[in-house]
Amino acid sequence: MAKSALHLARMSYQPKMPASLQGAVKIIEGKATEAVSDKEEIAAIFPRTYGLPLISFAPGGERTEYPPTNVGVILSGGQAPGGHNVIAGLFDEMKLLNPDSRLFGFLMGPDGLIEHKYRELTAEVIDEYRNTGGFDMIGSGRTKLDKPEQFEAGLEILRELDIKALVIIGGDDSNTNACILAEYYASIDAGIQVIGCPKTIDGDLKNKQIETSFGFDTAAKVYSELIGNIQRDCNSARKYWHFIKLMGRSASHITLECALQTHPNICIVSEEVEANNYYLDDVVTYIAETVVRRSEAGMNFGTVLIPEGLIEFLPAMKRLIKELNEFLSQNDAEFKLIKRSAQRQYIKNKLSPENSRLYDSLPVDVARQLIADRDPHGNVQVSLIATEKLLADMTAQKLAEWAEEGRFQGRFSTLTHFFGYEGRCAMPSNFDANYCYCLGRAASILIAAGKTGYMAAIKNTADPVSEWEAGGVPMTMMMNMERRSGKMKPVIRKALVDMDGEPYRALREMRREWALSTEYVYPGPIQFFGPEHVCDSPTMTLRLEKNDR
């Protein structure tokens, strides 16, 4: 492939590692663990992988002869910067433990395992992708891996290739499936270990043991650069309000982090909206009031950051979406027979009275998007809902009403943006390059230790890399029971913005000042070379959360 000058320079970057991942490693097992909630139900579903101990690595173990081990790897779900470095770290540690070990990448996500499509990942292949963005080394996919017939189809190719361990790199849903697969293979004594690695730019796969998911650092910095560019333009022209929607279907971590980096005039946090039982009109009124106050100070411009999943956090909308999800999952075949022109009336007649009235009141585009095709996990595809345009239009309408009443004499012109794909395959920051490489090395060590049902984990990530701690976390420890597609299922719990956490508190303390003044920060592009405080610094979220731990 053709390479840019920066690409060539990044290929030679050697990721940093803590001492616990260098040389001989000692495995330290902690106490038995239990699920975050619904303990009895989770224990019953995962009898062979429940209650496993936490694992930490320490330097100074005895050098051991390891047999050659063939390993498979899958990239699952949406892309996130750093996935290639997870594979590179996995490969390098495998070869260090035994040069005769082999790594196979299943193509286009779980489908590659099920359909027996793969490629061997040699040093020549992997060296082309070190420190690069994207998942194009082997591709990714969103197929759910949760059925016994899929597990058996995968087992055929695993046995054919003499693969003893499978690494699944993905988000909470993908690692939930990895946990189910680990339990299934253990239940039939298949001799296949399953290890997970935490990936999602949304930042919603984290807990006390998993401090961050890879890709979040890079994506937040990419979006923050773009927001900073827009804010500089905004402060130069001084005639537009920019409504900017950011990735984050289930949580507002990206929006919050970008706000901390760029100081917008308004930052909507979905979790705050839900906690205060706000309605859509409450959010619109808050934005409009800020527009009025800035206009009175001679500032007919500003920026609004909006999380992708806001609609799902509005309590009334949440109830509507829940009923829609359950109804459509149970009546999918019948719904598909309804003409598109008649679908809205059909849905309205099937909903409860309260939800029917709300659904009928929605703009045509939003109502249509709520019943559009679901993702493979049965969820409304909220990224298709143009929340940024909806809020901009509703704010304009409210301001027009206020103007007629004499409450607003300013100007209000809007531009809308959605930053999503721009950050998914960016060249990983130094933080993500280091973090992902360490995750891959940790996954390989867990395999060598004979573990299954674990997720590779790195702690102390707000500190310099030399102080990071590596290990493994039982995936059942993160599980709870949730309703999915109308049924209660075990899933890894998503991490929402903590309303008592330091990152949110920092926003809350500054948001009024940001709203009434113009204190934009312009982060600029990700830096790969130069002083460590410029190139290697973690996110504001990680640094602030360090105070909570």
Swiss-Prot record:
A Gene Ontology cellular-component term: cytosol
One GO BP: fructose 6-phosphate metabolic process
Protein name, entry field: Pyrophosphate--fructose 6-phosphate 1-phosphotransferase
Cofactor(s), names only, from the UniProt record: Mg(2+)
Associated pathway: Carbohydrate degradation; glycolysis; D-glyceraldehyde 3-phosphate and glycerone phosphate from D-glucose: step 3/4
Keywords recorded for this protein, A-Z: Cytoplasm, Glycolysis, Kinase, Magnesium, Metal-binding, Transferase
Activity: how regulated: Non-allosteric.
Source organism: Porphyromonas gingivalis (Bacteroides gingivalis)
Pfam families membership: PFK
Listed GO MF terms: 6-phosphofructokinase activity; ATP binding; diphosphate-fructose-6-phosphate 1-phosphotransferase activity; metal ion binding
Catalytic activity: beta-D-fructose 6-phosphate + diphosphate = beta-D-fructose 1,6-bisphosphate + phosphate + H(+)
Name of the encoding gene: pfp
